[in-house]
Amino acid sequence: MKNQDQALIFEVTKEGRVGYSLPKLDVEEVKLEDVFESDYIRVEDAELPEVSELDIMRHYTALSNRNHGVDSGFYPLGSCTMKYNPKINENVARFAGFANIHPLQDEKTVQGAMELMYDLQEHLIEITGMDTVTLQPAAGAHGEWTGLMLIRAYHEANGDFNRTKVIVPDSAHGTNPASATVAGFETITVKSNEHGLVDLDDLKRVVNEETAALMLTNPNTLGLFEENILEMAEIVHNAGGKLYYDGANLNAVLSQARPGDMGFDVVHLNLHKTFTGPHGGGGPGSGPVGVKADLIPYLPKPILEKTENGYHFNYDRPEAIGRVKPFYGNFGINVRAYTYIRSMGPDGLRAVTEYAVLNANYMMRRLAPFYDLPFDRHCKHEFVLSGRRQKKLGVRTLDIAKRLLDFGYHPPTIYFPLNVEECIMIEPTETESKETLDGFIDKMIQIAKEVEENPEVVQEAPHTTVIKRLDETLAARKPVLRYEKLAPVQV
C-alpha cells in the first residue's frame, strides 16, 4: 500500500482477526444486565476494528512518520517556544513516587510530591519576582482567566464595581481579549507606535476609572522589549488598575529581568513552553499564576503550605475565587518543569535567554535582505518579517509556509500578530544549532528567489508531502465530522 493511501484502522479490519488472547477469567462472571440498566447496554456489538498486533504497529508507526515534532525537525513556531524537551524530564516524571500516586491519597502518603510542588512554587516566585504562586491553572489561557478573576475579585472587594475594562495592545495574543471577555470584562485596544511598542499617549487616553487591568507580554509579540514598562506601570497604577503579565515570552528574559520588578501585579507562566513540558499536541499544559501580596487572599483554593509538620493544602480561604481545576494542577508537567529548573540552575537559565536572543537576531539579520523587516531593531527571542514584497508578486505568506513543508520544516507562525501585514513570526529558541538555523535560512532565501523567478512553484506548494494543499474554505464550510465507513482494504 502506498504511503499516500494510508488506510484508517477501521479499513484494515478482517473479520475474525485478533491481536490478543485474554487469560481465563479469575473472578466470578457477572452479567451486564445485573449491573447496568438496559438503557445503558448496547443492542448491537460496537463496530471495532479486528486487526492483529502487527497491523496495529505498522498502522500507527506509519501515521507517526507523518507527524512533525521538535524531536524530528526544526519547529520555529513564533510565540510558542518549541524548544527541545530534555529526556531526563521524562525519566524523573516516571519515578514511581510521582507516576503511581493518586490525587485522593492522604496528604501524609504523598509528602514527596507535595515537597516538589512547594519547591517549584518557590523557584517560580524567585524567577518572576512575585510574592506567591499557585500551580492550579492547567495552561496559559486558563492562567490568564485565573489572573483576571483575581483582579476582578480584588476590585470588587474594594468596592470598585465600575472597573469593567481590560486594556490589551493591538499586538496582543488572541487569548488576552478572549480571557478578558470570559472573565466578564470589556476589552479596550491600545495602539502600537511606529517602533512596535505600546503608544504611551494612546495608553494615557484609554486608561481611566473604569480600567481594571492592562495585559501585556514583555517582550511583546513582535519580539520587542517594552522599554517604557516602568512608566506604563505607573500610568495604570495611578489610575487604580492592575498590570497583568502574559508569560508567553518569558524565555526572552529568564534570569535577566523579572516581571515583578517591572511593576506587574499578576503573572501567568507556561511551564509547557518556557520550562520544557512537551506541548503542541493538545496538552497537557501548566499555567501557574503568581501574584503580589495584595492579591494573595483571592488565590484559588486550596493553596499549598509548608509547616513544621510537613506540607498540606489549606482550604480555609474565605475570599478565594474558588477552585479553577480539580485537585492541584497538571502534576506531570510540574515534575518536568521542576527537573528542568534544577538541572539548569540560575546560570543555565540565564544562558537560555542569551542563546535564544542571539539565535533570533542572527536569523533576523540574515533574512532581512530578502523579506520586509517591519521593525529594524534588535529583537529578543523572536522576530517578525513581512511578506509584503512577495505579495506584490502574487505570492502570499501562506504560500511561503506551504513551500517550507517541502523541505521538511514546520512553518513559522503566520498572519500573527495582526498589526503586521503578511506577517511571518519566527522563534528559533536556544536549543537549535547554527547549522540548523543556516539550513532553514537557506531555504527561506531560496523561496524568496523562487517567488521572483518561478512563483508557480511556491503558489502550488507543497509538492512532496503526503497530503497536498487542502481546500481550507471548503473544510471550514462543509466539515466532515463523522467517520464514513468504506469498503475494507485488503492488506
Curated annotation (Swiss-Prot):
E.C. number: 1.4.4.2
Any one Gene Ontology molecular-function term assigned to this protein's record: glycine binding
Keyword vocabulary terms for this entry: Oxidoreductase, Pyridoxal phosphate
Catalyzed reaction equations: N(6)-[(R)-lipoyl]-L-lysyl-[glycine-cleavage complex H protein] + glycine + H(+) = N(6)-[(R)-S(8)-aminomethyldihydrolipoyl]-L-lysyl-[glycine-cleavage complex H protein] + CO2
UniProt function note: The glycine cleavage system catalyzes the degradation of glycine. The P protein binds the alpha-amino group of glycine through its pyridoxal phosphate cofactor; CO(2) is released and the remaining methylamine moiety is then transferred to the lipoamide cofactor of the H protein.
Modified residues (N6-(pyridoxal phosphate)lysine): K273
Name of this chain's protein: Probable glycine dehydrogenase (decarboxylating) subunit 2
Cofactor: pyridoxal 5'-phosphate
Family as reported in the entry's similarity comment: Belongs to the GcvP family. C-terminal subunit subfamily.
Assembly notes: The glycine cleavage system is composed of four proteins: P, T, L and H. In this organism, the P 'protein' is a heterodimer of two subunits.
Biological process, per Gene Ontology: glycine decarboxylation via glycine cleavage system
A Gene Ontology cellular-component term: glycine cleavage complex
Entry keyword annotation includes Ribonucleoprotein: no
InterPro entries, per the entry: GcvPB (IPR023012), GDC-P_C (IPR049316), GDC-P_N (IPR049315), GDC_P (IPR020581), PyrdxlP-dep_Trfase (IPR015424), PyrdxlP-dep_Trfase_major (IPR015421), PyrdxlP-dep_Trfase_small (IPR015422)
Enzyme class: oxidoreductase
